[in-house]
Structures are given as C-alpha cells and as structure tokens.
Amino acid sequence: MKKNKRTGFTIIELIVVIGIIGISIPAIFGIFFTMLRAQAKTYVLQEVKRNGDNAINIMETLIKQRVLGIYSDQALTTEVCSTSSSQSSGPLYFKDRDGAVFYFATENSPFQIASRTDSLEYYLTNQKVSANPFSIQCFRKNTFSPPIVRIDFDVNSYSSTTTRQEENAKIHYTTQVKLRN
C-alpha cells in the first residue's frame, strides 16, 4: 500500500497565518508611528529647553557679573531701583563696568530674545522658538540691599507650517538675579 505524501498546508493553517499577519501588521505600524510622534515631541522639547536655558543663563551671568546700574532710558538719565521703595518694569537699560549700555528685548516674529547695545545685537534664542510673553523688572527689598532683577518668559516651539500637537512645546522660565554691590 502506498502512502499519500501530501505537501503544502491545509486551509485552516493558511487562515490562521493570514489572521495572525492581519492582526500583527496594523499593531506594528501603530507602534512604529507612535514612536515617531514621541521622537518628534522629544526633539521639540529639547530645542525649547536648550533655547530657554541658554537665554536665562546668559541674562543671569551678564546681569550678575557686569551690571553697575539700572536705568529706565537708554540715555541713562533716570536710575531705577536705587531706593527700597522704587520698582520698575521693562524696558530696563543696564550700565556695565565698561560704561556701555545694554538691554534685553524680544524682537521679530517669532519673538526672539535679544541682547542689544548701541552697536551690537545678539540673539539669545533661535528662530525655531518664540519667547513670548517676556517680562523684566527690578526692585529692592530695602535701601541697603542690592537691586534684584526678575526675568520672566515663556519659550514656545515655533513653526509657521504645522499645528500638530506633538510639535508644540512650552516651558516657563523665571528667575531673580541679585546685583553685586
């Protein structure tokens, strides 16, 4: 008697394999696209954080190490925060140890934080982010304490072409810098 040697798969085996493939491929694509969106969000957050950290560190360092006086005008006629009762909010002009005047402002669209002097403009944030609202103010706790400068701003991701949620990020920055006597 001859044995029947069948090669191939039964219809049930084929249906099971096609079913498994049909279920697993959409799941794999879903996981893949979720990972891509998470990676895009991570990149945007890194960009926002890098720009915000850079801006706040430069402003803190310049104010702490270079500033001798704070004025409400670029001509340095009105000094602010010179007594305990005085307080002022932007724009604030800073006179440094070399006699130069500089200030911080937001300019252009997107709003970039810039450090400006009479002859130089240096952007502290790039065009991939927007720093808005930006607030700078000074006050004194008492007459014999040095002025304190409060800096407050939000750094947002900026893209004129997309409104996708994973490409939006926002970090709030605030600090107080005490001037040296």
Identify the residue ranges that each predicted region occupies:
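Bulky hydrophobic/aromatic packing residues
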Residues: 40, 54, 80-81, 87, ...
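Generic detector of short, locally flexible boundary/turn motifs and exposed helical patches
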Residues: 11, 21-25, 44-45, 114-116, ...
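Aliphatic-rich helix starts adjacent to a transmembrane/signal segment
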Residues: 2-64
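Short linear sequence signals and composition-biased patches located at protein termini or domain-edge surfaces
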Residues: 7, 131-181
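Conserved long hydrophobic alpha-helices within structured protein cores
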Residues: 57-65, 145-152
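Secondary-structure transition/capping residues
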Residues: 39-43, 70, 162
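Type IV pilin-like appendage domain
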Residues: 72-143, 168-170
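Short, well-structured beta-strand/strand-turn elements
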Residues: 64-74
